[in-house]
Amino acid sequence: MKWLSRILTVIVAMSMACGALIFNRRHQLKAKTLNFNHKSLTIIIPARNEEKRIGHLLHSIIQQQVPVDVIVMNDGSTDETARVARSYGATVVDVVDDADGKWYGKSHACYQGVTHACTNRIAFVDADVTFLRKDAVETLINQYQLQGEKGLLSVQPYHITKRFYEGFSAIFNLMTVVGMNVFSTLDDGRTNQHAFGPVTLTNKEDYYATGGHKSANRHIIEGFALGSAYTSQSLPVTVYEGFPFVAFCMYQEGFQSLQEGWTKHLSTGAGGTKPKIMAAIVLWLFGSIASILGLCLSLKYRQMSVGKMLTVYLSYTTQFIYLHRRVGQFSNLLMVCHPLLFMFFTKIFIQSWKQTHRYGVVEWKGRQYSISKEQ
C-alpha cells in the first residue's frame, strides 16, 4: 500500500500547487478620504421581502462619512420591507410590472431605479449587504475615480456567517471570486468581461449607453451580462474583494434557501471561467478527497504511515482555510472537515447541471427563471 500512499501524496501536492495559483493575484480596495459635502452618489437597492435584512444595510449607509441618496425599489414585497426602508429615510419606489410580463426580478428593479436617481454616479447594492466601515462608500467612489469615472466597478462582499449551516456556502463563495479569472496569474490578462452582482458602481451615461440592466433581462446572474455589455462598448470593468469595507450575510432563511440560492447561481456561473483556471480549480478541490482518503486508508492499513497521511491532510487543510479566510468568516470545524463541504458542493453542482440541461428553469423567491437562453 506504500505505492498508494505515494500516489495520493503526489496528487495532494499537485492539488496544493493549483491552489497556490488560483488566487495569487489580489484586487483589494484602498481606503481614501474624499470629504464630499454634497450628495455625489445614489444607492439603488432592489428589494423583495427583505424586512429582516435591509435595516442593517440602511443603518450602515447612514453611518457613512459622505451624504448619499438612497432609493429602495420595492419589488412586490408582501412583508414590511417598505415600512422599514422609510423608517431609515430611504425613498421607496414600487416596481412597475413590465408590459408583457416577461421581464422581472432584480435587473428589472434596478433599471427602473436609475430613472429616479438624481446623481450621475449610481450604485446598485443588494439588501443583504452591509458597509463595515464609515469610509466604505468614500473608498468605492475613490476607486471608481481611479478608473477615470468610466465603466463598471463591482465588489464581492466578505461573507459573514451567523449560523452553522451558513458555512456550507464557503466553497461557493471562493469559487465566485476565483471563477472571475482575474484573481489568478493563469489568466492571460485580457479585458475582464464579468462583474460581481452584490455591489456595482457606474455612471448614468455609460449605463444607458450599454443598455444597463436591460442587457441582463434574460439572465439570472446579472453581473455577467452587465460586464459583457460594458466590455462590448470598450468600457473598463473592474472587480474587487470586499474585505474590510463591504460584507454580507447570505441565505439566513434556512438551509433550503441556501441550496436553492447556490443552485441558481451555479446554473449560469461556471461557464464564465476560463478552461485552464477551471482545470486548476477542479484539481485543487479534488485534493480534499485525496487527502481524506489517504488518512482513512492509513488507519486501516499498517503499510501506510498515519503520521505522513495526517501531515498531508493538515497541509491541505491549512491552505484550504487560508484561501477561504480571504472571502469570508466560516466555522473552523467546517473548514477542518472540508471533505463534507466538497461533497455538498458536488451535490449542488450536479443538481444545478440537471436543472440547467434537463429542465431549463430554476426557482427563486417564488418566481421561475428560464436559463436555457443563457447558455
Swiss-Prot record:
For this protein, the record's Gene3D superfamilies field holds:
Spore Coat Polysaccharide Biosynthesis Protein SpsA, Chain A
**Gene label:** crtQ
Topological category with respect to the lipid bilayer? Multi-pass membrane protein
Q: Which CDD domains match?
A: Glyco_tranf_GTA_type
Q: A Gene Ontology molecular-function term?
A: glycosyltransferase activity
Q: What is its EC number?
A: 2.4.1.-
The protein's matches in SUPFAM superfamilies, at most eight in alphabetical order, are given as: Nucleotide-diphospho-sugar transferases
Q: What is its main location?
A: membrane
An example GO BP is:
carotenoid biosynthetic process
Q: Which family does it belong to?
A: Belongs to the glycosyltransferase 2 family. CrtQ subfamily.
Gene Ontology CC terms, in alphabetical order: plasma membrane
Q: Which UniProt keywords apply?
A: Carotenoid biosynthesis, Cell membrane, Glycosyltransferase, Membrane, Transferase, Transmembrane, Transmembrane helix
Indicate the transmembrane segments per the record. Answer: 3-23, 164-184, 277-297, 330-350
The pathway it acts in is: Carotenoid biosynthesis; staphyloxanthin biosynthesis; staphyloxanthin from farnesyl diphosphate: step 4/5
* Protein's name in the database: 4,4'-diaponeurosporenoate glycosyltransferase
Residues in a coiled coil are none
A Pfam family that the UniProt record links to this protein = Glycos_transf_2
Highest taxon of the source?
A: Bacteria
User: InterPro entries attached here?
Assistant: Glyco_trans_2-like (IPR001173), Nucleotide-diphossugar_trans (IPR029044)
